[in-house]
Curated annotation (Swiss-Prot):
Gene3D superfamilies in the record: 2.60.200.20, FAD/NAD(P)-binding domain
Highest taxon of source: Eukaryota
EC class of the enzyme, as a word: oxidoreductase
Chief localization: plastid
Protein's recorded name: Zeaxanthin epoxidase, chloroplastic
Protein's organism: Solanum lycopersicum (Tomato)
Annotated FAD binding sites: 87-115, 365-378
Keywords, alphabetical: Abscisic acid biosynthesis, Chloroplast, FAD, Flavoprotein, Oxidoreductase, Plastid, Transit peptide
């Protein structure tokens, strides 16, 4: 069974052609392999560039008539008088408020937005950083305004066509990978992106129009007399409209005036966040990771432009504070011993770019509004950030609310009756409650999983913590992985694609610029293949006692240029000679070589041996004359810990000063 989109325009307009729109057949059994065959990806210096998408869209032959401008004929053939435009008041100019204002404006409504401070995102300004907009929200934006959605997607960094998922915080090993690409392309949805909150807000504000947004206008109260709604600003000004939408955040004044005061729920976690000028070695293959630990976890995401956004969550009571200039130091202590992917980002972030906030949410409620007033976004269902769906749900809310108001106006025009605003608001609320409630619960479950995650037996057991040295996998980790592997595809399919059929008039399409690597499916199934695909420089950084006088060793990826390590130079042997003038190092100690993107060390029957400590803390002596595979974050010792080196994979080679800072930071951690 196929559901096919037909593109039937014989004479497409120049505006359509300028967008490079192409016809595409969408099948329920649409194969990602077919999608992979489309050439679309642009790379420069190994980093993904943003390419304006090629997409499919049906051409509409005539401009739509908004419901408020619609006329009809009475029984005697006389035209009815066009209806007066609805006056919509919006409290809050954050993402949800602006998206709804845009949706309402596109449908011909008279909109007025009140925002306390449009110069910065509420609470954290420019340092709050990027936001992830997933496929479901991008599709809703397309249904609201295709051109604005295009601007947003072009300004964003695509992460959904790379590997994303959960890893163990200490070892860095993959725990579970998320496929957000297949659910999107199979349903003709845009692929997930990350975009700066400030950039997103600026695009939306420009599209809404400065004449619609009243800056420095804080709504503190409202009056609903059944016929109209009047908002009261902090400065005493009053404005009247047909309805009021509260989009004023987790501490919503509109919500408080509707249902009385209530406290937000503390998640149990405080969150540090920052943006680092850093490019991970696997930036081309990995979009974002969630590093799991016991009662702490760490999230990192590529945000484009050579920057990484990170969030560090730590379980502790609310209201804590750090010593002056003490955030970075505390984080290095909390996450000391974690994998390099975490430590690298903390080291690369300036102290004054790190912010701290406690994480709150609000439990789902059955009442979203009353009379001519309703709520959307964080004002009614603030979520924990673990699924990246908080802003996405606000965007979906905005589309649905504007749609219900449009339907009410259409019914009014058809039957010549007053617009039933109250019923349309309740219809919007009913349409959204179940989906929002489920996703809200999933976000909480993700936090619970992070709270209870234990990699090994003994973690969090106090006197029994010595058991961790035996590296026995915790049964909960093993069972949890089975559950996640089975349930995650279904969950992602529903979260990303479950709202697509409600987007009336949106044509399913795929952008060629969102093409994934041909090896994406293999990377999901094979961790080794994913590591081999890493296009980076491999280095050995001095890391042991007494090794501070040693220099970093840059390894060659050329299979014909091995490195020979010894206490004397070996210029007569093909390849690169590395001299370590230490008594524990034999004259010809070991050889390091590269094969198919992987690195191996071979001990050449040295007197004191070659030792490897892997990323899970297991130390072993390599067999003589037998190549032993090593990985980033492993430690290699040539004879003793005085000639110990930590394996690093870097996107760009480090300068000498940076190598010293990296070594000092790792040793301190």
């Amino acid at each position: 069974m196929y559901s096919t989109v037909f593109y039937t325009s014989v004479h497409p307009s120049t505006s359509v052609l300028s967008r490079k729109q192409l016809p595409l057949l969408i099948s329920k059994d649409f194969s990602a392999e077919l999608y992979h065959s489309l050439p679309c990806r642009s790379l420069e210096n190994g980093h993904i560039n943003k390419v304006k998408g090629v997409k499919v869209k049906a051409t509409i032959a005539e401009a739509p008539v908004t419901p408020t401008e619609k006329t009809d004929s009475g029984a005697n053939g006389d035209l009815k008088v066009p209806q007066k435009k609805l006056k919509v008041l919006v409290a809050g100019g954050g993402i949800g408020g602006l998206v709804f204002a845009l949706a309402a404006k596109k449908r011909g409504f008279d909109v007025l937005v009140f925002e306390r401070d449009l110069s910065a995102i509420r609470g954290e300004g420019q340092y709050r950083g990027p936001i992830q907009i997933q496929s479901n929200a991008l599709a809703a934006l397309e249904a609201i305004d295709l051109d604005v959605a295009e601007d947003i997607m072009n300004a964003g960094c695509i992460t959904g066509q790379r590997i994303n998922g959960l890893v163990d915080g200490i070892s860095g090993n993959w725990y579970c990978k998320f496929d957000t690409f297949t659910p999107a392309v199979e349903r003709g949805l845009p692929v997930t992106r990350v975009i700066s909150r400030m950039t997103l807000q600026q695009i939306l504000a420009r599209a809404v129009g400065e004449e619609i947004i009243m800056n420095e206008s804080n709504v503190v109260d409202f009056e609903d007399d059944g016929e109209k709604v009047t908002v009261v600003l902090e400065n005493g000004q009053r404005f009247t409209g047909d309805l009021l939408v509260g989009a004023d955040g987790i501490r919503s004044k509109v919500r408080t005036n509707l249902f009385g005061p209530s406290e937000a729920t503390y998640s149990g976690y405080t969150c540090y966040t920052g943006i680092a000028d850093f490019v991970p070695a696997d930036i081309d293959t990995v979009g974002y990771r969630v590093f799991l630990g016991h009662k702490q976890y760490f999230v990192s995401s590529d945000v484009g432009g050579g920057k990484m956004q990170w969030y560090a969550f730590y379980n502790e009571p609310a209201g804590g504070a750090d010593a002056p200039n003490g955030k970075k130091e505390r984080l290095l202590k909390i996450f000391g011993g974690w994998c390099d992917n975490v430590i690298d980002l903390l080291v690369a972030t300036d102290e004054d770019a790190i912010l701290r906030r406690d994480i709150y949410d609000r439990p789902p409620t059955f009442s979203w509004g009353r009379g001519r007033v309703t709520l959307l976004g964080d004002s009614v269902h603030a979520m924990q950030p673990n699924l990246g769906q908080g802003g996405c749900m606000a965007i979906e809310d905005s589309y649905q609310l504007a749609l219900e108001l449009e339907k009410a106006c259409s019914r009014s025009a058809e039957f010549g009756s007053p617009v039933d605003i109250i019923s349309s608001l309740r219809s919007y609320e009913s349409a959204r409650k179940l989906r929002v409630g489920v996703i809200h619960g999933l976000a909480r479950m993700a936090a619970i999983m992070a709270s209870t995650y234990k990699a090994y037996l003994g973690v969090g057991l106090g006197p029994l913590s010595f058991l961790t040295q035996y590296r026995i996998p915790h049964p909960g980790r093993v069972g949890g992985r089975v559950f996640i592997d089975l349930g995650m595809p279904l969950m992602l399919s529903w979260v990303l694609g479950g709202n697509g059929d409600k987007l009336e008039g949106r044509i399913k399409h795929c952008r060629l610029s969102e093409k994934a690597n041909d090896q994406l499916r293999k990377w999901f199934e094979d961790d080794d293949a994913l590591e081999r695909a890493t296009d980076a420089e491999w280095l050995l950084l001095p890391a042991g006692n007494g090794s501070s006088g040693l220099e970093a060793i840059v390894l060659s990826r050329d299979e014909d240029v091995p490195c020979t390590v010894g206490s004397i130079s070996h210029t007569n042997i093909p390849g690169k000679s590395i001299v370590l003038p230490l008594p524990q190092v034999s004259e010809m100690h070991a050889r390091i070589s590269c094969k198919d993107g992987a690195f191996f060390v071979t001990d050449l029957r040295s007197e004191h041996g070659t030792w490897v400590t892997d990323n899970e803390g297991r130390r072993y002596r390599t067999s003589p004359n037998f190549p032993t595979r090593f990985h980033p974050s492993d430690v290699i010792e040539f004879g003793s810990d005085k000639a110990a080196f930590r394996v690093k994979a870097m996107k760009f080679p480090l300068k000498t000063s940076e190598r010293k800072e990296e070594r000092e930071a790792v040793e301190a951690a």
